Structure formats: C-alpha cells, structure tokens
Amino acid sequence: WDLECKIKNTSIWKLMGVTKPTTLPGSYTVVLDEPEKMIEDVSNHLEFPTLKLKVNKNDLHQILTKTRELSPNKVLIVDANEAFNIDDLKSNADLFVKTKIDLIEQPLLSENDNELKGLNFPISLCADESFHDSSDLAKMAHKYNTINIKLDKTGGLSEALKIVKEAKKLDLNIMLGCMVSSSLSMLPLLPLYEYADFIDLDGPCFIANDRKNGLIYENGMMLVKEDLCWG
C-alpha cells in the first residue's frame, strides 16, 4: 500500500477513498501491577478518553471501583490476557456491571473459549489471543461480541480490510489494537478507523524512540499529521 501511494504520488486516504481525520481518540494501557501503582497510573493519564486495565483475578474490586471513581465518563476496558476461568468471569459479572466496564478482552485461555458459547454475558467480550486472521472469524461469532485486529497478527492492511468487512456481516464489533511497537506498526490501521468501535493504538507510548513523523499523542488524542512515515 505504501509503495503504491509513492508510485501514484497520492495518500493512503485518497487511495482508499477514506476521509482523513485530524485527530482520533487515544487509549492508554495501565499495566498489571500492585493496585496502588495501577491506580496512580490511572490518575496520571485521565486525559485519555479510553483506559485499558491489564488485570488478573486479584484485587479486581479495588482496581475497578477506584478507576471508575477517578474516571466516571471514560471508556474502560478490562484486559484479562487469558487470566480468568469461566467461574471467575461469571462471579465478577456484577462488579463489571456496577463499574460500567465497556469491554472485557480475552477473559479465558484461547483453548478454553468454547466455554463462552451461548453465554449471555452483560459485558461485551473481545477476542485477542483467540483471533488472528479472517480464517478465525466464523469461530468467533458465537463466543465473542468484538474482535481485536492487530497488524502483527493479520500480516497487513489487506487482510485487516478483509476482516472488518466480513466481521460487520457477522455483527462483530471491531477493536483496532497493537503490540508495543513504533508508529510504523499503527499507521496502516488508521484508514480503518470508520469501522472501529474501539481504538487501542498506544504502542508508541511505551517505547523510548518512535519513528520520525509518527503518531503524536496530545491531551489524550492521536494527532494524524500530513507527513506521516507511512501512507
């Protein structure tokens, strides 16, 4: 895609027929730590519209309750990274509802996610480790409400574009996600922003030196400049 843009002397936005945004809502990930340190991290990043909390089954009540108190109007995502079993998930349902969690990412081990089939859970569940590319889509529809698309898993924008179109037919919501990596790994997902229900592209926030002309995060927003290093 980037090469075609250069050959045709155009932008990825024009090539794909997508309106280029000037800003997109940013997300910040609070990594798993002692509850007090996690809550301090939350309090230091309240400018972000979305906060994602990496958790396991320990100290959930303290972490979620205090985070919601500090951020009453934020989108809150809980990322269990496969740390729950099905009983953990069910037993904390009331807590998730009370603290108005918007999304729970990969609650169970991917090998155990058949246990989610037919579960009428009150919070949207998102597949991450369970989902890699379009060949997994049919398996997701009866277990999850949302899929996390990462270029590190799909292999590139072409496959990601195929995924979002097929996912919408299956009534699956879309999260645009990332690993800890530079802006070069985020930028090819940006043209899909109109499909996204959640945008979680904070990878460059966790590296010392990002690519030149990469994403800029300002007041919790991603600034989409004209002279980006891709597209």
What are these regions (language model features)?
Residues 35, 56-72, 84-89, 108-120, ...:
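Active-site-adjacent beta->alpha loops and helix N-cap segments on the catalytic face
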Residues 1-76, 83-87, 94-97, 211-231:
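N-terminal capping/lid subdomain adjacent to the active-site entrance of alpha/beta enzymes
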Residues 71-75, 151-153, 161-177, 220-227:
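P-loop/Walker A phosphate-binding loop and immediately adjacent motor/lid segment at beta-alpha junctions
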Residues 29-31, 49-58, 75-82, 99-111, ...:
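Catalytic beta/alpha-barrel core
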Residues 177-231:
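Flexible C-terminal active-site loop/helix
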Residues 46-49, 70-74, 94-102, 119-125, ...:
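Glycine-enriched alpha-helix->loop->beta-strand junction motifs that scaffold or abut catalytic
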Residues 86-96, 133-144, 155, 163-164, ...:
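Catalytic cores of alpha/beta
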Residues 9, 79, 104, 140, ...:
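Conserved, mostly hydrophobic/aromatic
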